[in-house]
Curated annotation (Swiss-Prot):
Isomerization of pyrogallol to phloroglucin. Disulfide bonds: none annotated. Mo-bis(molybdopterin guanine dinucleotide) binds at S175. The gene is athL. Belongs to the prokaryotic molybdopterin-containing oxidoreductase family. This is Pyrogallol hydroxytransferase large subunit. Keywords: Metal-binding, Molybdenum, Oxidoreductase. It catalyses: 1,2,3,5-tetrahydroxybenzene + 1,2,3-trihydroxybenzene = 1,2,3,5-tetrahydroxybenzene + 1,3,5-trihydroxybenzene. The keyword Oxidoreductase applies. It comes from Pelobacter acidigallici. GO terms for cellular component: outer membrane-bounded periplasmic space. Residues 82-104 are annotated as: Disordered. Its EC number is 1.97.1.2. One of its GO terms (molecular function) is molybdenum ion binding.
């Protein structure tokens, strides 16, 4: 028996110590710091108390359970080929996914060698490129990948795919949506996709906060992003100081249950009715910051007339908001008065931005409403800001270690943030080179990920904005079409990473797409046999980040979330050790691409003769790490806690704006040409625009969008209980926020330990069902009891779920988390009820507005009933 070895690694849920014995992982734990060698923690003095964080990291539930996913029996053990697929004969696309209908998808496949798999795929690549050109090859990854800056999708994936040539399916700004498509036009921050900066807000809040309004915000669930439970202690500190916590969310979320003093539950799609009523109260009672608004707002007077009903005849009173939202007028009015009276921070979304309300048909106006309220109370002044308690920690922002979005080994300046700093530090242009794309550009061919089915199954398609359109406010207004002029339609799909069926919208479309005869070849590169993997012709088994080398920083994304390591209580850089050999015949993504690069005769350019560990060393040397230790020292220790910078100047977010000064925060935007004399916001006027100049220009050019007018307006949700005829047939509004225990699909299914958490899945007759939460009044009216199997359905599909009867929703609202990893159709895939729990089958594929090409998956009407066992093969 061997000794236990402690190694280091990291994950989407935090860095860990990994304990390995005899070549197997036996446990993972958060990192505990060594006081003798690791840098001391920061301290904040506020209200006569000293605050300092624990001397350790925290991890999310899915990281705590990662061992069960590594050794899951649903790991793909070796390359496989669909039995009914003959690359030299009958391809039978109509039989893709046939095994799903028999509840035995493995039976569709036969084992093949890596050599045979690569030969088939390379032959198809070459055939398709000769016949149609590289634009006929489509690929896209999942949003959240295995952690590590070398292995991440912006890095290894783009390095290879750019060399091979492909059409990329751009990701919609799914975390930002309303902020991106609406908020950006009101206050800029395009380099953050419409979210505000958060620097030094923890100290500001500890010193000044009297109330925090958490609106569509559940930081105990979403960890900000990637940051485990780092911010939990900050809310404990604030509660100990007597700060009032108010929550506005249709569902009494996990953070609210822990710390809420008051909870408001509006009907789905009506949050902005509350924000208008609060603004109305402030206007009528003269309880807003008039001097601040006069100096910093554009179009406010005209907007105020609209709120007061002078222009449309409908005053946005608290009584009006009650009719829309179901929240009593007296409570809305009381909240407005307390807000105006106290030093109040607005926690809009879980990051200071984001939030499930932004992913809805009213998301644009909700985000603009949040900015409007913050502006009316003087955001940026001490005691008034937009802050969700998840960021704003006093760390060293000058120490340079790039996040995963800075491109890693790709150096792709078009599709990552590599061009800001990192590409120039990573590649010398003599011995090592980046891998840019001449196809995946605004002038080449690309498609929206949300419309992959339409592009494959249909003809021409048009949309606005290339993915995360953050280069400038007006970039998202640029029009695109598929196929791009001179480029081919898609004939091959190389699917990479986690499932779309549980994460996109109206996802029966994706299941149907795979069987379309225009799609000649499908490859799936995945770790687990889940989601849409059973639709592939060839399956390539990838490994987890615990089975390869990598390097990273705790929670550091960068890119459109700059400096977001401030989610964490310490900056922790990790060497991600190859803890074990890859399970079965699986390989790292880098080694998979290296195999293909060799057969495509581009291996020398792709790898430059380096393995992953050599790339990690090159990466290390391109950061500020060598200022503190050598590569050998880092390799031996495995992690580094970045010390505090005693000379750092504190720069509270938006304080510069409130005081009319030059911007002094370490943020990397706006560009110099987007400001006048380096003052003001990124907008044309430099002010918060209640009437957006950019949208006004768009309208004057003939692009009229009734769901995104130039003035911040109350626009009813287009699929709502009050304003939609569909409500007669489907009377329940469905909320589908991010899951509590898994990271989107990461952690769910896979026979992982998460399946045994009774608030994640419920076992009925030996099968673990996804949960739908139902108010007791709605349940009783339908004869539904706690634990019953129910069918949730609408015109888009049916999903079989376990009912959880609760009082944590108001009547008329149901709640089920998005991002199920299991797709288990009871009949024909894409045309029958799913019992895996893919709730996004029921969400609309309609864009958030005509020219705002984002998802509105929190806008959905459904009906529920006790399940009678039928397959419902009717779609």
């Amino acid at each position: 028996m061997g000794e236990v070895v402690r190694l280091t690694n990291s994950s989407t849920g935090g860095p860990v110590f990994v304990y390995v014995k005899d070549g197997k992982i036996i446990r993972m734990t958060p990192m505990d710091f060594d006081d003798a060698v690791d840098a001391p923690s920061w301290k904040i003095e506020a209200r006569g108390k000293t605050f300092t964080p624990p001397r350790k990291t925290s991890i999310a539930p899915y990281t705590a359970g990662f061992k069960s996913m590594i050794y899951s029996d649903l790991r793909i053990p070796y390359p496989m080929k669909r039995k009914s697929f003959d690359p030299n004969g009958e391809r039978n696309p109509q039989l893709r996914g046939a095994g799903l209908s028999k509840q035995d998808p493995w039976s569709d496949y036969e084992r093949i060698s890596w050599d045979e798999a690569t030969d088939i795929v390379v032959a198809e690549i070459n055939r398709i490129k000769h016949a149609y050109g590289p634009s006929a090859i489509l690929s896209t990854p999942s949003s959240h990948h295995m952690w590590g800056n070398v292995g991440y999708r912006h890095s290894t994936y783009f390095r290879f795919m750019n060399m091979m040539g492909f059409t990329y399916a751009d990701h919609n700004p799914d975390s930002w949506e309303g902020w991106h498509w609406g908020g950006m036009h009101m206050w800029g921050f395009s380099w953050r996709l419409g979210n505000p900066e958060q620097y030094d807000l923890l100290e500001d809040g500890l010193k000044h906060a009297e109330m925090i309004v958490f609106w569509s915000s559940d930081p105990e669930t979403n960890s900000g992003i990637y940051a485990g439970f780092e911010s939990n202690i900050r809310r404990q500190w604030l509660k100990d100081l007597g700060v009032d916590f108010v929550f506005i969310d249709p569902h009494m979320n996990h953070t609210a249950r822990l710390v809420a003093d008051k909870w408001f539950s509006p009907k789905i799609g009506t949050d902005h009715a509350l924000s208008f009523a609060i603004a109305y109260t402030w206007l009528k009672e003269d309880s807003y910051d008039k001097e601040y608004v006069a100096a910093n707002a554009h179009g406010f007077e005209e907007w105020a007339d609209y709120v007061l009903g002078k222009t449309d005849g409908t005053p946005k009173t608290c009584e009006w908001a009650e009719e829309e939202s179901g929240v009593p007028a007296c409570e809305i009015r009381a909240l407005a008065r307390q807000w105006a009276k106290k030093n109040t921070y607005l926690a809009a979304g879980g990051l200071g931005g984001w939030g499930g309300a932004c992913r809805a048909s009213h998301g644009i106006e909700w985000a603009r409403g949040m900015i409007a309220l913050a502006t009316m109370q003087g955001m940026g002044k001490p005691g008034s800001n937009m802050w969700s308690t998840t960021q704003g920690v006093p760390l060293d922002y000058e120490f340079y270690f790039p996040g995963y979005a800075e491109g890693g080994i790709s150096g792709d300046c078009e599709n990552s943030a590599a061009g800001f700093k990192f590409a120039w530090r990573m590649f010398d242009g003599k011995t090592t080179f980046p891998s840019p794309s001449n196809l995946n550009t605004s002038a080449g061919q690309h498609i929206p990920r949300l419309k992959i089915p339409e592009c494959i199954m249909g003809g021409k398609f048009q949309w606005s904005g290339k993915g995360f359109a953050g280069g400038d406010i007006s970039h998202q207004l640029h029009q695109y079409e598929y196929p791009a002029p001179g480029y081919s339609k898609i004939k091959m799909f190389w699917k990479y990473g986690g499932p779309h069926l549980g994460t996109m919208t109206a996802t029966n479309r994706y299941a149907k797409m795979y069987t379309h005869d225009s799609l000649e070849f499908v490859v799936s590169q995945s770790i687990w046999f889940e989601g849409e993997v059973p639709f592939a012709d060839i399956i390539l088994p990838a490994c987890t980040n615990f089975e390869r080398w990598d390097i990273s920083e705790f929670a550091n994304c960068s890119g459109y979330i700059p400096d977001n390591y401030q989610l964490c209580n310490h900056r922790v850089i990790s060497l991600q050790a190859k803890c074990i050999e890859p399970v079965g015949e699986s390989m790292s993504d880098y080694e998979i691409y290296r195999l293909f690069a060799k057969k495509l005769n581009i291996e020398e350019m792709f790898s430059e003769g380096k393995d992953e560990l050599a790339w990690c060393e090159q990466y290390f040397n391109a950061t500020d790490m060598p200022k503190y230790m050598t590569w050998d020292e880092f390799f031996k220790k495995g992690y580094f806690v970045v010390p505090d910078n005693p000379n750092r100047k504190k720069t509270v977010a938006l304080r510069w704006f409130a005081e009319g000064r030059e911007k002094d925060t370490p943020d990397w935007g706006p560009r110099l040409n987007n400001q006048v004399c380096r003052k003001g916001l990124q907008t044309t006027t430099g002010k918060v625009e209640f009437i957006a100049t950019s949208l006004k220009n768009f309208e004057e050019q003939g692009y009229i969008d009734e769901h995104r007018p130039s003035m911040h307006t109350y626009v009813p949700a287009w699929e709502s209980q009050k304003h939609s005829p569909l409500a007669v047939k489907y009377p329940l509004g469905m909320l589908s926020p991010h899951p509590r225990f898994s990271m989107h699909t990461m952690g769910d299914g896979k026979n992982s330990y998460m399946n045994y958490i009774k608030d994640h899945r419920v076992e009925v007759d030996g099968y673990k069902y996804w949960i739908m939460r139902v108010n007791s009044i709605d349940a009783e009216a339908r004869g539904i009891k706690n634990g019953d199997l129910i069918r949730a359905y609408n015109d888009r599909g049916s999903v079989i779920l376990a009912a959880q009867v609760t009082e944590c929703l108001q009547p008329g609202t149901v709640h089920s988390y998005e991002s199920c990893a299991v797709y288990d159709p009871l009949g024909t895939a894409g045309k029958s009820a799913d019992r895996g729990g893919c709730i996004n089958i029921l969400t609309p594929d309609r864009y958030i507005s005509k020219y705002a090409c984002g998802m509105a998956n929190n806008t959905a009407l459904v009906e529920i009933e006790k399940w009678d066992g039928d397959k419902y093969e009717i779609y």
